[in-house]
Amino acid sequence: MRVLAAMSGGVDSAVAAARAVDAGHEVTGVHLALSRTPGTLRTGARGCCTIEDSRDAWRAAEKLGIPYYVWDFSERFQADVVDDFVAEYAAGRTPNPCMRCNEKIKFAALLEKALALGFDAVCTGHYAKVVEGPDGHKELHRAADWAKDQSYVLGVLTAEQLEHAIFPLAETPSKAQVRAEAEERGLSVATKPDSHDICFIPDGDTRGWLADHMDLDPGRIVDTEGNELGEHRGAQAYTVGQRRGLHIGRPAPDGKPRFVLEIRPKTNEVVVGPEQLLAIDVMEGIRPSWAGLPPREVAALGADPKARSEEFEVTVQVRAHGDPAPARAWLTRSEGTPRLHVRLDTAQRGVAPGQTMVLYQGTRVLGQATIDAAFADRPHAAV
């Protein structure tokens, strides 16, 4: 097959490209230039998308003896990821830009261009697994190394995208083995530190970055009764579950800390309260999609614009490296608009609108939806 290897400049994508070559594919390396100003970004452990990363990717491609190109996707990245990130925070939601990048850039714009140029598949260094299901369709599963598993951020992939995705690190037992293999292959990125932060906020200061990219007006911090407790420095820069940085002078009557419970962008208010009020057991999601074929309970709905599926058992994850929680899920449609509902067996805390919930059955990723509402439907203690 003709395979386009997305090379970020890190060790994972370099080893993935090398394994694609070993598998006998005709491999071409490509580095995506996502930043309009890569020279201003930090290099090293906390950044990516820098000029240094592009050079590291080129060195790896040269070592592997494969063609290498740099494609400028900065305008699309700005519109689909960065601008979306700002818009979501402005609306009081907490987005996941890495998932949006996979959805709109790596497995949409990149894959579209790759197929148009005659490539058969895109190869990346993600820790995830694509397998053929019993019905012959491709399925997305967790990687062998659950500590590094990235199936959560790939939950946005569609059935068609899975048909053209290759993840050579799927069965790798540990990151240490990837680094050892890179060392054996003579790849200079073998000891390069991982990047952990949002790539366009390499110093990790999300609040500071938002202050530079949107209007953050001071407003009231209130309790659930509407009593004013203090003043915030921009409601959109807070997130549900946050405890630090509230600057509330008046202590709670019980002396316990307060947490952000809700962001109200229309009134520019931040609502705070005790930890137990963070606990939720129901989540509702918009824009659901399925990684491969939908569950049979959903498929049974057909094209009915007003319907409710049967419930099906799942585990659900709301953070990239969060613990999967047992739950039951079902899909409803109202005037043709789908909405995913999840009822957790045990209450969870700190779930914010804008986050993504990814559904699993065993190791298989079923699909995902953007959380639109999260609330407590039955009494329970804080978790």
Curated annotation (Swiss-Prot):
Interaction with tRNA, as annotated region: 148-150
Coiled coil feature spans: none
Location of the protein in the cell: Cytoplasm
Entry keywords, A to Z: ATP-binding, Cytoplasm, Disulfide bond, Nucleotide-binding, RNA-binding, Transferase, tRNA processing, tRNA-binding
Binding site for ATP: 6-13, 32, 125
Active-site residues per Swiss-Prot or TrEMBL entry: 101, 199
EC number: 2.8.1.13
Enzyme type, top EC level: transferase
GO cellular component, one term: cytoplasm
MF (Gene Ontology): ATP binding; tRNA binding; tRNA-uridine 2-sulfurtransferase activity
Family according to the record: Belongs to the MnmA/TRMU family.
Role played: Catalyzes the 2-thiolation of uridine at the wobble position (U34) of tRNA, leading to the formation of s(2)U34.
HAMAP family: tRNA_thiouridyl_MnmA
Name of the molecule in the record: tRNA-specific 2-thiouridylase MnmA
Organism taxonomic ancestry: Bacteria, Bacillati, Actinomycetota, Actinomycetes, Micrococcales
